Amino acid sequence: DTESFANPGCKDSKGKTTLNINIKTEPFSLHPGLANDSVSGGVIRQTFEGLTRINADGEPEEGMASKIETSKDGKTYTFTIRDGVKWSNGDPVTAQDFEYAWKWALDPNNESQYAYQLYYIKGAEAANTGKGSLDDVAVKAVNDKTLKVELNNPTPYFTELTAFYTYMPINKKIAEKYGVGLFNSTFSVLSF
């Protein structure tokens, strides 16, 4: 199958740019909370951006986050969302988009196979296994620009985890109306 991606920031004289990428099979899902294979993950990594991304040296660096603060005990992370970042429809990317996406993946009704990737977060495993509430999951959008996350234990590689596709944001307003269909990275999927 061939995917077509549009890069809204780089356009030809007709105002369009398309990048065709040949992949071996159709993605299982383009929903960050449902993707469970390398093909889906590859497409998501090209069309969504998490709080962090892994650079060419294999190290995490800021993605949607412009600033990352860690508490002295290593159990609380505060992420500041970059100014000016938008979804492909022009809506701003907010801290609420991350909170919504992570709790969506943890909701046992959604059967996210990779929800366990979020179990580092306080209350996440209990919520996903039905022994706790999603309201008790310690991820909170303090405001549009600030996401606070409390972990069960110090997890020095947590910023690397936030580059994984299960940690990508979802535009709640659009997802609840249409399902996933917006992207917050350089490219958007046009067809596959």
Where are these predicted regions, by residue range?
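Second-shell loop/turn segments in exported
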Residues: 34-35, 81-92, 136-137, 181
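N-terminal lobe/hinge region of extracytoplasmic solute-binding protein
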Residues: 22-72, 188-192
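Sec-exported extracytoplasmic/periplasmic mature domains
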Residues: 52, 56, 73, 86, ...
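Aromatic- and charge-enriched surface segment that lines or borders ligand/interaction sites
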Residues: 67-114, 148
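Short, low-complexity disordered leader/linker segments with a strong preference
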Residues: 1-18, 59
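Gly/Pro-rich hinge or "lid" segments in bacterial periplasmic/extracellular proteins
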Residues: 151-192
